[in-house]
Regions:
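N-terminal secretory signal peptides that target proteins for export/translocation
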Residues: 1-8
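Bacterial N-terminal signal peptides
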Residues: 10-22
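Signal peptide processing junction and immediate N-terminal pro/mature segment
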Residues: 20-35
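Flexible, low-complexity segments enriched for small/polar residues
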Residues: 31-42, 46-50, 55-69, 96, ...
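N-terminal accessory alpha/beta regions
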Residues: 67-190, 194, 199-210, 215-219, ...
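Active-site substrate-binding loop specific to GH73 endo-beta-N-acetylglucosaminidase modules
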Residues: 147-158, 162, 168-172, 204-219, ...
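Surface-exposed interaction patches
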Residues: 186, 211-212, 236-237, 568, ...
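Alpha-helical scaffolds flanking conserved acidic
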Residues: 186-187, 225-226, 446-447, 647-651
Length: 664
């Protein structure tokens, strides 16, 4: 090797010791309002070596090391680094903030995004209507193609519509690549998969930016009940699982009718009415526009009562009925788990309690409680009685019950242990994490701390025990070469090409957390080809010229280059087979897998897969799910024409496709 490991790291260590001293000299949490810095020292020996522990935390609590990160963790200490990551508000993250600020749409209010989306859709509908009146029966796709070719203003408008989803996908990956708050980004990815919403369902592509920005990110390391409530009231989830349309069964009285009847009974029949104060108490979140409020204020109390009763009757006529979708997924996927001890009767009772939890799909698209849709009768959920006559508080009571249930503690603890430790985490660790959940009333930060400071986390069996998801693979590859964040959609599209489009899982269970789901022949081949694409500079911002070792290794021998790449990309450890592949420049597995890929699937269009470009024609295909239900990636060349790499670029490309890099 050109440099020994000590020489390789010494300059960075010298600088970072001073930086770490500055970190420890920061004002106290009380002075700055930051989260406490809790350093947990090991209470028993750790099986992993010191070097392995550094790699473990960088690859599990983050998306892999950037150049210099290994030295930083060594200088700071593994336990101190963990403590700092668990207090992300103490970490300066200006680079990530600047990247996020460069996107056009992710900071825009949902109402503005809806208006933006509607303008383009309205123009298309108007042209369709004009065509229909003239007898033209061309399809919407033909019309869209004509508009895009002939109307620059509308073309730009439709591009903005596509960008709404593309921006939030790209920004999520860019943050994972550049952010210093790595654990926070890992937890955002975890919860957005746990509380999965599908961008391909209608207006959800417009609701997802706020879901990411206002619901998940502020609560990723916070309180589980708070996070659960924010998700339950988010337009993205309300729309995705049809909760916004769920209303009391026609056989059940609604809250508006019941309260209206009680208000009327207090007056003589000819003078029964409703004051504005009573209306506000009846529906405190009604989101009345100024015009609507003025109109109601101008009415007599009797007229106002009549409007409320008419609205309640209209709600009953809407025939929306009780929808169990969200209630079922709330219990099965979000809290208790499939074995959580609930019954179909519990699902129905939860759905009844949540009737009236809806939103205005247009305008502000904010959560609103509609009393005319709410089932007013008594409910019994998991043995807990929710008295009749309640309103929005019925749903809050349900969230309280399930968030604090022991089955939820175990389910969340197990899922976090799978994410951080192994696909089959030790039962004792899961139990300790579940107890932390219960003792802290769902403190996510405390549960994660229990897991990532445990002996099981630092066991030999946990080291490189996890297979990277497509998102983790792309982010870690870009971090390894010190790539600049890609603010186009191309890199985010690559995540979809590898099998897991960002916000692209249609079913509510989210992408799999276990490695077997990502390791079939097509997936492995695509991962190998992705490594070649990265080394060839096929992604904006991701070129080897950014890698700090590139310049001085150009003139090194092949063996020296291989040793340096193994140190930088694998933490210094590789199998003899991998080392031989890096030395000779040939991957026999790639050739074998290429021969097994069907010829008719040898082309795929990266430009439209798993992105906001849902209206573009799709070339190639995505394989049907495997027999076990696991996703299969698209197969083919999504990286342009094949390229033959040489020298150091070849070593790097092969390293990214190697098993050691595919695991974390």
């Amino acid at each position: 090797m050109i440099r020994t490991r000590t020489n390789f790291l010494r300059p960075a260590v010298t600088l970072l010791v001073a930086a770490c001293a500055a970190i420890t000299a920061r004002p106290t949490p009380a002075e700055r309002g930051h989260s406490p810095l809790i350093v947990v020292s090991p209470t028993e020996p750790r099986e992993q070596t010191a070097d392995q522990q550094v790699q473990q935390v960088l690859n599990r609590l983050g998306f892999g090391p950037r150049p210099g990160d290994v030295a930083k963790v060594r200088a700071l200490g593994v336990d101190q680094w963990i403590a700092l990551q668990l207090a992300p508000d103490r970490i300066e993250d200006g680079a990530a903030e600047r990247v996020v600020a460069s996107y056009e749409t992710i900071a825009k209010p949902t109402a503005e995004l809806i208006a933006m989306y509607d303008r383009g859709q309205l123009a298309i509908r108007q042209r369709q209507k004009a065509r229909a009146q003239s007898g033209d029966t061309s399809s919407k796709m033909d019309l869209r193609a004509e508009v895009l070719q002939g109307d620059p203003a509308l073309r730009e408008q439709l591009r903005q519509n596509q960008r709404i989803l593309g921006d939030v996908q790209s920004a999520k990956l860019a943050r994972a690549v550049v952010s210093e708050r790595q654990l926070d980004e890992v937890m955002v990815d975890f919860w957005e998969n746990h509380f999965n919403v599908f961008a391909g369902k209608g207006l959800d592509r417009i609701f997802i930016p706020a879901f990411d920005r206002d619901v998940i990110r502020p609560n990723a390391l916070g309180n589980f009940r708070t996070l659960l409530g924010a998700v339950a009231k988010s337009p993205a989830m309300l729309f995705y699982l049809d909760q916004w349309q769920s209303a009391a069964d026609s056989t059940q009285p609604t809250l508006a009718v019941a309260r209206g009847a009680r208000a009327g009974a207090r007056r003589a029949a000819p003078t029964a009415g409703m004051t504005m104060e009573e209306l506000d108490r009846l529906a405190p979140n009604a989101q009345l526009t100024p015009t609507q409020r003025k109109r109601l204020e101008a009415m007599t109390s009797e007229q106002r009562m009549q409007v409320v009763q008419q609205r309640a009757q209209a709600g009953a006529r809407a025939k929306r009925g009780l929808n169990e979708n969200y209630a079922r997924e709330l219990m099965e996927l979000h809290t208790l788990g499939v074995d959580g001890g609930y019954t179909q009767r519990d699902i129905i009772e939860v759905a009844r309690a949540l009737t009236g939890w809806t939103m205005n799909p247009r305008g502000t698209a904010e959560f609103v409680f509609r009393p005319e849709m709410h089932d007013v009768a008594q409910k019994v959920v998991l043995g807990h009685v929710i008295a009749g006559g309640g309103g929005v508080e019925d749903g809050e009571a349900v969230l309280d019950i399930v968030a604090r249930h022991p089955a939820t503690a175990h389910f969340i603890a197990h899922k976090l242990a799978v994410r951080f430790v192994s696909d089959t985490p030790p039962a004792a660790l899961v139990e300790r994490a579940a107890q932390t959940f219960l003792k802290t009333d769902g403190d996510i930060r405390a549960v994660v701390r229990t897991i990532v400071t445990s002996a099981e986390f630092f066991s030999r069996s946990a080291y490189r025990a996890k297979v990277k998801s497509p998102f983790e693979l792309v982010a870690s590859a870009f971090r390894a070469i010190d790539a600049q964040p890609d603010t186009t959609m191309r890199s985010a599209q690559m995540v979809g090409f590898l099998g897991a489009p960002i916000f692209g899982h249609q079913a509510p269970n989210g992408w799999p957390e276990t490695g077997e789901s990502w390791m079939n022949s097509g997936a492995i081949l695509n991962r190998i080809n992705f490594g070649v694409g990265v080394a060839a500079g096929r992604f904006p911002g991701a070129t080897l010229s950014h890698w700090s070792e590139m310049e001085h290794l150009k003139a090194a021998t092949r063996e020296q280059q291989v040793d340096a790449v193994i140190l930088a990309f694998f933490g210094g450890q590789s199998s003899p087979d991998t080392r031989e592949i890096l030395l000779n420049g040939e991957n026999p597995l790639a050739a074998k897998l290429s021969a097994s890929v069907p010829a008719d699937s040898a082309s795929a269009d990266l430009g439209v897969m798993g992105t906001g470009a849902d209206n573009a024609p799709t070339r190639g295909r995505v394989l049907a799910p495997a027999k076990n239900g696991a996703p299969r990636p698209a197969v083919g060349r999504a990286l342009g024409q094949p390229v033959q790499l040489n020298g150091l670029a070849q070593v790097v490309g092969l390293a990214i496709g190697a098993p050691e890099f595919q695991r974390r």
